[in-house]
Amino acid sequence: MRFDLEPPSHASAAHRVAVLLVNLGTPDEPTPRAVRRYLAQFLSDPRVVEIPQLVWQVILRTLILPLRGRASAKKYAAVWLPEGSPLRVYTERQVESLKPLFAANGYRVIVDYAMRYGTPSIADVLAQLKRAGAERVLLLPMYPQYSASTTATAFDAAFAALGRMRNQPEVRTVRHYADHPAYIHALAEQVRQYWAAHGRPAFDSGDKLVLSFHGVPKRTLDLGDPYHDQCQQTAALLMSALGLTTFECRVTFQSRFGKAEWLQPYTAPTLKELGAAGVRRADVFCPGFTADCLETIEEIGMEVRDEFLHGGGKEFHRIPCLNASHAWIAALGEIAAENLQGWPVRVATAPEAVT
């Protein structure tokens, strides 16, 4: 096996620690070519599509990429921000917000981000962190609920990069934080602040809050993936924090791909049914997405909105994701601090948690 080229080893006074946020990824630009390149990498991951690769690659290259590339590019163009892809923009803001938070609490750590698909890649950022003197890296996926198709494949990519290194850094991973009190608090605060600015649904009159999580094939649940259970756990804790019951709140799953059965109930049909049943207002919040992206802005904010209004609903609200909200940045800092314990982060003072 050939290892990546590295400079000669020498005693380093840095001994630095890094916190690496890892998210899914995004095309570099909203063009058919860039989107096809991104989708080819994403949909070629056997963790994402569990079909024999010889068969799947023929379907992917001859049918899916030619058809979806242009259509998906139009959707990305509809949500693209002046600074770039929403997912990248909000992830960068999370990083830039975490840096002063750590510094203010005496933590001397490098904070950066990487994408599982597209750029910046996990391998490239790990190499960059090594060059910056990082000898210990905390991998912090931006997936609160564990799934093999998100968390595990991010770890796969990180460990594959480590496998090519002669001089490996020490690595820790955060598996999930679906029930972490700080995460639940951040979710509840996001909803409360939105309602404070836009009005609270009239739950006594039948208005609904829908908690929409990204779907996965139902088969993965049957094969032992804990994702569904953790989504339900998050939803139950959030409902409790908001003082809501299953009468006021529904849990659904979105972004179904292909014809196989996925986790149900599906988000879009549920909103259409609510509109047809006379529900006047529906608010949709996506607790499993830590940053707004195509699936939240376009799929929920445009497609699902139309389903609800065309079904008979009168008022639709998409509550923004956590993004770089104060409560979420504080939660990220707390989650990271708990997992940095025992590492030489050179704390000037010794706070119990990053706040």
Curated annotation (Swiss-Prot):
Keywords recorded for this protein, A-Z: Cytoplasm, Heme biosynthesis, Iron, Lyase, Metal-binding, Porphyrin biosynthesis
EC identifiers of the protein: 4.98.1.1
Source domain of life: Bacteria
InterPro entries: Ferrochelatase (IPR001015), Ferrochelatase_AS (IPR019772), Ferrochelatase_C (IPR033644), Ferrochelatase_N (IPR033659)
Record carries keyword Phosphoprotein: no
Recorded catalytic activity of this chain's protein: heme b + 2 H(+) = protoporphyrin IX + Fe(2+)
Keyword Metal-binding attached: yes
GO molecular-function terms, A-Z: ferrochelatase activity; metal ion binding
GO cellular component, one term: cytoplasm
Class in the EC hierarchy, top level: lyase
Known pathway: Porphyrin-containing compound metabolism; protoheme biosynthesis; protoheme from protoporphyrin-IX: step 1/1
One of the GO biological process terms: heme biosynthetic process
Annotated compartments: Cytoplasm
Primary location: cytoplasm
Binding positions (Fe cation): H214, E295
Function: Catalyzes the ferrous insertion into protoporphyrin IX.
Classification via HAMAP family: Ferrochelatase
Family: Belongs to the ferrochelatase family.
Listed name of the protein: Ferrochelatase
Classification of source organism: Bacteria, Pseudomonadati, Pseudomonadota, Betaproteobacteria, Burkholderiales
